[in-house]
Amino acid sequence: MVICKRCKLLDATLVSRKEPFCDECFVKFISLKQRKQMMSDDYFQDIFKISYPDKKRGQAEADKQNQDSNVLVPLSLGSSSLAVLDILNDTLLEQKQTHRGKTGFHVEVITICGQAEFEEVRGKIELLKSKYKENSDKILFHIVDRNQFFAVPFDLQEITLYIDNFNTLVRSSNNPSTTVEKVLASAPNKTAKEDLLNIIYTHLIKKFALQRNFKAILWGHSMTKLADEVISLTVKGRGAEIAGYLDDSSLDSKYNTAFRNFHPGRDVLLSEIDAYCHIKGLSQFSHNYVVQDTLFYDKFVDKPTKNVKLIKNMTMNELARQYFDNIEGDYSNVISTVVRTGAKLSNPDNELNQIMHCSICNAIIYKNPVNWLDGITVSKPFVIHNEEELTNYNAWEAANPDKAEKLNKMSDTPAKNVGVCYGCITTLTGMKDRKLEWIRRDDKAELTAVLQEYEIPSDDSEQ
């Protein structure tokens, strides 16, 4: 057997970054990486450290800072978010033990899900509550239905893309039956579905953080996840969002500069997160994800005998993830290079006269995508020049009356550009009838519209 290189006492169970680890040393290795990020600057130190009276503040001020230091953890029940929560729980326990019951921060956990998966998700959350019962006063759980995205007190809108000039027309929509499921059913492919779902989940999470005055959102993204997101954003025409996506040092300007986004797992590979979850027994809490055994000497995951998912059926994120999964073992430095390079990017120069946000994803539009697309594409139909072409067109019109009527209607309707980014224009291009039912953003309404949660039974009662 190989001996652990850290403690030099126990047998190694896995190898990471070409170094053999025993279980105990590896858990400490991963935990310290997250805790190092938690102390990365003064803002996060003020959140996670216990405040005591000093020359600058009295006892009351110190206690208030400890009480107000609350963070939100979006829990997808994948390995990365489970690991982030587990390390926070261990940190709280250590603070209680070493500071006579005091802690420096509070944690609230939010899980977004659909109605179809609610019962399974609720069961997983109940198990987690039981596991972390020693911190039941410091860790609170919330489950929110993803259809709360449309259950808001302000108007819905129907956004239509006109392919001949890439402009968008918006009409008010009072459709009470609009749901996330119906919107996804109109999406052209898995990449578009994933893109829209990511926008919906992100908005719900950040809205929750804004309403409840959280200091930070702790996103459970590994280094591998961040790398595949950098590549995917680039391919999907959302490269301008990379700088903001990886920014842990600024308050979120799109949500009233109320909180910071934070990625405590940005120095840890997904395979390392999976190994941590297996050692700590967190695999039982995962949902729609199988913890992998990539780093372990003794394998425990049944490998499929054939490639189940074809490349043509994969989303852009899945393709990027597959690539990084394949190189993690021998070329993990490529993953860290992608993340470091993305973190060095800054926001593009704004070429518009004002700050404009995309009506769909809320990203800042730095350059008019309509003008850019108009310069590189030919979207208008070829002009009819002779009798033969006119005869062919009339024959097509007679054979396709519905399409012809729709085409004429779209051509006659004046287009109005309401501000949609290039990435969302790409998504709209493939939507059914190039239409999308969406919310009309209103900052004041965002603050007053409280998200409704599913009820989770307390520890001492059943509901």
UniProtKB/Swiss-Prot annotation:
Q: Which UniProt keywords apply?
A: Cytoplasm, tRNA processing
Q: Where in the cell is it found?
A: Cytoplasm
Q: Name one GO cellular component term.
A: cytosol
Pathways involved? tRNA modification; 5-methoxycarbonylmethyl-2-thiouridine-tRNA biosynthesis
The Gene Ontology biological process terms listed for this entry are: protein urmylation; tRNA thio-modification; tRNA wobble position uridine thiolation; tRNA wobble uridine modification
A Pfam family it matches: CTU2
Query: Which residue windows are coiled coil?
Result: none
Tell me the Gene3D superfamilies matching this sequence. HUPs (3.40.50.620)
- State the Gene Ontology terms under molecular function: nucleotidyltransferase activity; sulfurtransferase activity; tRNA binding
Tell me its family: Belongs to the CTU2/NCS2 family.
PANTHER family linked to this entry: CYTOPLASMIC TRNA 2-THIOLATION PROTEIN 2 (PTHR20882:SF14)
State the protein's purpose. Answer: Plays a central role in 2-thiolation of mcm(5)S(2)U at tRNA wobble positions of tRNA(Lys), tRNA(Glu) and tRNA(Gln). May act by forming a heterodimer with NCS6 that ligates sulfur from thiocarboxylated URM1 onto the uridine of tRNAs at wobble position. Prior mcm(5) tRNA modification by the elongator complex is required for 2-thiolation. May also be involved in protein urmylation.
Specify the protein name.
Answer: Cytoplasmic tRNA 2-thiolation protein 2
Q: Which organism is it from?
A: Kluyveromyces lactis (strain ATCC 8585 / CBS 2359 / DSM 70799 / NBRC 1267 / NRRL Y-1140 / WM37)
